[in-house]
Amino acid sequence: MRFKGLDLNLLVALDALITERNLSSAARKINLSQPAMSAAVARLRKHFRDELFGMRGRELVLSSRAEGLAAPVREALMHIELSIMARHPFDPARLNRRFRIVLSDFVTVVLFRNVVARVTREAPAVSFELAAPTDEHELLLRRGEVDFVIRPDFFMSSTHPRAALFEERLVCVGCCTNRELQPRLTFDRYMSMGHVAVKHGGAPRTPVEHSFLTDLGPTRRIDILVQSFSMIPPLIVGTNRIGTMPLGLVRHFQRTMPLRIVELPHPFPAFTEAVQWPSLHNSDPGSLWMRDILFQEATRMATTQELRVTSSPEDAEPPGHFVRSVSPLP
């Protein structure tokens, strides 16, 4: 089919090239041979009178013209897809789709592994591509290159819809044998102890720690920098080092490691983990279905945490472990 001289099938090829940034991957995505995809690139360049793509190794680098086409082309294809899908009842059991999601190791452990288990039962043909958070999530949403971003809500873009999932807070964690880690940790002791800290971007602190540490001024003694929260527990067990981590993640590691949880020496407000999706996916049945699962599993997680705290004494945490419930969202 042609529209004003353009074969509309080329838009499908263009969208795949923009999304995959690799000729072979884009060809596989839309079931074309590599020579056929190369021919499509030549036709696209001729139509738009622009190179559209350069090469950096095996990666395609978009020209400014291709950058400008990314969102409109994705949105146009999504509208066509939704119009076709609207004629048929949505059935997750028959859904064959890969969801691309940006989320942290923390969210993966405390929430998303349960989401994956449920989706495997309800929609066995659905798969996932998970990516670590970056500073470019708004651009990824605008291009439609990801289906969801799960991050603290204060990092969310104002140009796309979002919804709260659950609340969390940071705590101090150390090994149960760490005699320097007292139940009431003073600020001076906290700052002087050796820390295993997460490096986010170029800064030796996570974004959720930023206001806590910036407001208080002094710099922590950082012994080890790591790339994720999940790397902290193995590096503090059997040592006098401490870390600052989300409470839910520490509870997960407490099942297999001798960890002690202590309140931070200065009040730090809870933060809300939220989910955001591209505006053009707002009415997408698959996106709506996945959102419902995220909301339901987040509520289930919060309820389970409440039950743990209110359970009988024999089910309580071992002595020396501090536990406080994370309030579920209203």
From Swiss-Prot:
Keywords linked to the UniProt accession: Activator, DNA-binding, Nodulation, Repressor, Transcription, Transcription regulation
Top-rank taxon: Bacteria
Keyword Hydrolase: no
Region annotated Disordered, chain positions: 308-330
Protein name: Nodulation protein D 2
GO biological process, one term: regulation of DNA-templated transcription
Molecular functions (GO terms): DNA binding; DNA-binding transcription factor activity
Family: Belongs to the LysR transcriptional regulatory family.
DNA-binding residue intervals: 23-42
